[in-house]
């Protein structure tokens, strides 16, 4: 079993100011978005100009941050924040939701499109290929922080990793499993899936490769966005089987996690949209 490297979450500290790796992962994501967006403009595969791309980035950042935070509040810890509403603003304590951030960006796309006279689906198609590498960057940030670890796996598995931050969860899990209790006593940690890296590979690298290659040719309006929607939903659904469910929610109906249930409508809408828009092209 490998032990998580235990990176210092703070990259640079100057007096009271601290630059954290997780914040840097978001910044890197936005930089990659801009770089890829300009490349698509040069290739003639974008509805953006260089100026409008920079303008949209501001809208997108607001959508990601506000949507991600509100999504986490509503989807994951609503009762806690209802009792302590001021905690909503304590973003430095963590708590962001991809699905909330996605909805925030969709709203930003809608508003931006109306302002600039760009069709909603065309703008969605343009934005979709620019997103996955940012998601990959965010998952690396999660890994550096040693958060969002995976479920318990076999002690002899080559991918098994111990997370010191999970000791409370390890003790709770071992209390219900004699074998895990032996492992915990012997190694001080339970072997877990490094699910952040799985999500980095699936939702980041694989999704980017599929969408980037697919969108290099002219496609029916809405197909690229649908591929992103369904592709992310499928990859997230798969990765969630290795990811530790949120301790305050656990597994829900049919033994699925909140992340999986939130991904189901993405999968359905993505598949339906991909087929429907593809049929329009054929006619």
UniProtKB/Swiss-Prot annotation:
Keyword Transmembrane found: yes
Q: Where does a 1,2-diacyl-sn-glycero-3-phospho-(1'-sn-glycerol) bind?
A: 139
| EC nos | 2.5.1.145
Q: Under which pathway is this protein filed? A: Protein modification; lipoprotein biosynthesis (diacylglyceryl transfer)
**Keyword ATP-binding carried by entry:** no
A Pfam family of the record is: LGT
Q: Which InterPro entries match?
A: Lgt
Localization (cell): Cell inner membrane
Enzyme class (EC, first level): transferase
Q: What keywords sit in the KW lines?
A: Cell inner membrane, Cell membrane, Membrane, Transferase, Transmembrane, Transmembrane helix
**What are its GO biological-process terms?**
lipoprotein biosynthetic process
- Residues that span the membrane, as ranges: 17-37, 56-76, 88-108, 222-242, 255-275
One cellular component term (GO) for this entry is: plasma membrane
A GO MF label: phosphatidylglycerol-prolipoprotein diacylglyceryl transferase activity
Q: What membrane topology does the UniProt entry give?
A: Multi-pass membrane protein
Task: Report which superkingdom the organism of origin falls in.
Answer: Bacteria
Task: Check the record and name the HAMAP family matching this protein.
Answer: Lgt
Q: What does this protein do?
A: Catalyzes the transfer of the diacylglyceryl group from phosphatidylglycerol to the sulfhydryl group of the N-terminal cysteine of a prolipoprotein, the first step in the formation of mature lipoproteins.
Its family?
Belongs to the Lgt family.
Q: What is this protein called?
A: Phosphatidylglycerol--prolipoprotein diacylglyceryl transferase
């Amino acid at each position: 079993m490998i032990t998580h490297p235990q990176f210092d979450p703070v990259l640079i500290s100057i007096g009271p100011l601290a630059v954290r790796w997780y914040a840097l992962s978001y910044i890197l994501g936005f930089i990659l978005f801009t770089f890829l967006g300009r490349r698509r403009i040069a290739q003639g595969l974008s509805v953006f100009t260089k100026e409008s791309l920079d303008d949209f980035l501001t809208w997108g950042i607001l959508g990601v941050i506000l949507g991600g935070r509100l999504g986490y509040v509503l989807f994951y810890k609503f009762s806690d924040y209802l009792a302590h509403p001021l905690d909503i603003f304590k973003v430095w304590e963590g708590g962001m939701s991809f699905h909330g951030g996605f909805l925030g960006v969709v709203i930003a796309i809608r508003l931006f499109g109306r302002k600039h006279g760009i069709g909603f689906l065309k703008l969605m198609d343009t934005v979709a290929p620019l997103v996955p590498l940012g998601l990959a960057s965010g998952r690396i940030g999660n890994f550096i922080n040693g958060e969002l670890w995976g479920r318990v796996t076999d002690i002899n598995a080559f991918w098994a990793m111990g997370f010191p931050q999970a000791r409370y969860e390890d003790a709770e899990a071992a209390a219900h499993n004699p074998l895990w209790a032996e492992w915990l006593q012997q190694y001080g940690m339970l072997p877990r899936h490094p699910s952040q890296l799985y999500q980095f590979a699936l939702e980041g690298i694989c999704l980017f490769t599929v969408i980037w290659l697919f969108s290099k040719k002219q496609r029916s309006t809405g197909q690229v966005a649908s591929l992103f929607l369904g592709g992310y939903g499928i990859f997230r659904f798969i990765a969630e089987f290795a990811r530790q469910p949120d301790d305050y929610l656990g597994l829900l109906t049919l033994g699925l996690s909140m992340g999986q249930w939130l991904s189901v409508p993405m999968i359905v809408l993505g598949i339906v949209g991909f087929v429907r828009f593809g049929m329009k092209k054929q006619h």
